[in-house]
Structure formats: C-alpha cells, structure tokens
Amino acid sequence: MLVDNKARSIGLKRQALLDIARGEYIAFVDDDDTILGGYVNAILDAAKGKPDVITFRQRAIYNGLQSEVVFGVEHQDEPFTPGGITKRAPWHICAWRREAVAQCLFGNTNYGEDLIWSKQARRMIQTSVHIDQLLHEYRHDAATTEAPEG
C-alpha cells in the first residue's frame, strides 16, 4: 500500500507507482478522472495484440467547459477546444505496455509531470491500437484542485 504523505512531488509519486507496477500495461487514473463503462474490457481486448500504447476517446470538462479528446499516435497536442473535438497524442492516461516505457521517468515536479513523461513515452511507440469509444472522463475544476496551475 502507498500512503500519500504529501512530502513528495506528484512526479515522484507517479514514478514510485510505475516502479512497483508489475502488470503488462499501465495507465494513470487520478481523483479527477473517471473510467467509463466498457473501459476494462475494451483495454483487455485491445491488449491481446500487445501494442505499445492503446488510445481512446475522452470526455474532458475543464472549469465547466466540455470537449471530446481523441487520443491517437497520428495526432499532435491541440489546445483544449470547448464544444468541439480536441486531438492529442497519447498521454499518461492511455494504456501503455509497461515494458515499452520502463525507461521513461517522471520528473520531480508538481506540474507538467504527465506531459514530460508522455513525451518520453511517445518516442518509444512502435505499435498502437485505437479504441474508437468514449472510455474516460477528465473533470478539472480550478476551485477544487490541489494541482498548481501552470
């Protein structure tokens, strides 16, 4: 069991989780994330082919504004588009084959550690599968988050 004593940065906490992970795939789900119906079965089915990363669609709500985020290896990171579609390269919330990204490290920081790690992991991708389903929801509220704004 890991206990959050708040003495470490978010990046070091994520790294500790990655270091003890033993499953074939890893994905990070935080308290502002919700996995939607069908997530586990869809990921397990897609993992049968052993791709380096499994991407999907996400509902993102940022300070009350909503967008659908489509993760895919063919995409660059677009700015959040309220009321529309936002295309992004794979992030840490996607399912990653642990062995493919084992050498990627989270930085000792409380902001942007997810993007730092994701950019490293993206360079390791040789194979991918995209699940064209809404499987994840991200809900950010500046009034309640503990994460610093960047």
Question: What are these model-derived regions, one by one?
Answer:
Residues 111-117:
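Acidic donor-binding loop at a coil-to-helix junction in glycosyltransferase catalytic cores
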